[in-house]
Amino acid sequence: MKIAYAVGLALLVAAPAAPAMKVEVQTSPGTSYPVKMTSLKEARFRNTVRQKYDFSCGSAAVATLLTYQYGDPIDEQSAFDIMYEHGDQAKIGKEGFSLLDIKRFLASRGFQADGFDVPLERLEVEGVPAIVLINERGYHHFVVVKGYKKGRVLLGDPARGTRAMSRRRFDALWTNRIVFVIHNERDRAIFNSPRDWAVAPAAPIAEGIERNGLGPIVMPKRGPGDI
């Protein structure tokens, strides 16, 4: 099984953009098993809707929120078309969708949503996902907060798929401190789903050693004749 795991891991990393496929994994001479492989890139977009346009992260974020966090399936194009039709089209073309556009769209589907200035821990307590605006590399971008636990924030990013980051890193990107949440239909909300977290597991070494903890560890300086 170690051989199968090693081969599978190599294929997973080596083909990040490849679709799901079946490969034959040999576990012993003359014995092989078909294994379905899914690339990391494909897995990250399994529960996050990928945005089609540079300015459509808002429609992709709301499609992610409804489809995967509230069980109300809708594709990005449908959300985009409806919000664009009822919004300020000139402004949308320059700046993308606003939270007001998203609020109106959600209301048309029976969801009551508003923005709140509350700490991230409140989402964990209430068990509800949220849309937030982050500023990454100079670009404003809507993402869905799918989970938060043990100092890690799980995001449904329409541009990069489901990914996790430290709370410190998230706070640096989340400059306006506003969470946009649906406050009815609470029984339908999905937050901290194991299926979502499975795509972005913490690295084992990161759990055991803090980066700063490596500072005192140095290689000894060897002298002549030392091995």
Please state what every model-predicted region is.
Residues K22-E42, M83-N192:
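Conserved active-site-adjacent core of cysteine acyl-enzyme catalytic domains
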Residues K2-G8:
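Sec-dependent signal peptide recognition
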Residues A4, P16-E85, A90, P204-G208, ...:
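Active-site-adjacent structural segments surrounding the nucleophilic cysteine of cysteine proteases
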